[in-house]
């Protein structure tokens, strides 16, 4: 499930069901599916300042991870977000934004401390979480936001 490579428009993700490497677009409608077995893929992508606005355009819950490679707590959060992207592959899109390479997105969200996770739905910021959180806390937040989205529908 670990992204294998990325560019400005897509990331390569291994299918959790069959292991096939699939290119996952940063911005696409619908769900990313495995080209081989057609299982839902975790939607975990790297976005840039240029692709960010398209990346958050989805009806799914979006979890934006503002991070940097030198940040220890960011490295601790990364596997948790990967796991959540697998566990909620049909309802959650995780977007990773490297703050060192994408200053505009960082400024737009006033990211002064990282890791910083931003929950977004339909373009609206629902919650901002600053600092590394344990998996149970992040899972609760995802479930709370998904429940609120379901109740609003």
Each model region followed by its residue ranges:
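Thiol-based oxidoreductase modules, predominantly thioredoxin-like and allied folds used
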Residues: 47, 66, 77-104, 111
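Cys/His-rich microdomains that often coordinate metals
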Residues: 22, 40-41, 78
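A short beta-strand-turn-helix
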Residues: 45-62
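Short linker/helix segments within small regulatory modules
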Residues: 24-32
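Short pre-active-site segment immediately N-terminal to redox-active cysteine/selenocysteine motifs
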Residues: 60, 67-70, 113
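Residues immediately within or flanking Cys/His clusters that coordinate Zn2+
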Residues: 10-13, 31, 68
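Non-catalytic, surface beta->alpha helical segment in thiol-disulfide oxidoreductase systems
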Residues: 113-152
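Short cysteine-rich clusters marking metal-coordination/redox-active sites
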Residues: 15-18, 34-37
């Amino acid at each position: 499930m670990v992204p294998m490579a990325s560019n400005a428009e897509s990331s390569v993700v291994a299918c959790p069901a069959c292991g096939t490497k699939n290119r996952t677009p940063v911005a696409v409608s619908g769900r990313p599916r495995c080209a081989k077995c057609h299982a839902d893929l975790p939607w975990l992508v790297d976005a840039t300042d240029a692709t960010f606005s398209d990346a958050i355009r989805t009806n799914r819950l979006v979890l934006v991870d503002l991070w940097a490679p030198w940040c220890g707590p960011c490295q601790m959060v990364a596997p948790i977000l990967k796991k959540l992207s697998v566990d909620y592959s049909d309802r959650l899109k995780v977007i990773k934004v490297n703050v060192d390479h994408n200053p505009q997105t960082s400024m737009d969200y006033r990211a002064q401390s990282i890791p910083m996770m931003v929950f977004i739905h339909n373009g609206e910021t629902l919650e901002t979480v600053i600092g590394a959180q344990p998996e149970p806390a992040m899972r609760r937040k995802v479930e709370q936001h998904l429940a609120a989205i379901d109740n609003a529908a």
